[in-house]
């Protein structure tokens, strides 16, 4: 009986889309973290006008990334992140880099980074981008106009408006 429950539980956990992280190194103000996520999903669609073929699509994927930071001095921190998106079916799109940036964070003045990152307009939209599927696609689903991930973007972020909020 226990084996049957375990045999059903393990695949369910793999398909559930769990995200995990592991701290690889943390010493003297230097930190490196490895993280990942696996999602198993299939979309069923209706075919019209007698179209032939499978009426489902495998949209399973895995994401793996590494991020790190180093304390340069008590007020200045360097940080970076790299994240890769791996599609299970890989039929239409090759594996792609989701994030790849490096930057500096100053204690009282915010942070500045450069690379492939989410644009600053996404910060406002991120509060509503919580859906399981197709969330925020109405205006933030592209790699343009700083509304989602984009290449070669320099971003400045400040969380407390220079200590006034």
Segments from the language model and where they lie:
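Alpha-helical architecture
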Residues: 1, 16, 69-72
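Serine/threonine-rich low-complexity intrinsically disordered regions
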Residues: 1-2, 93
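Sec/Tat signal peptide C-region and signal peptidase I cleavage site
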Residues: 15-23
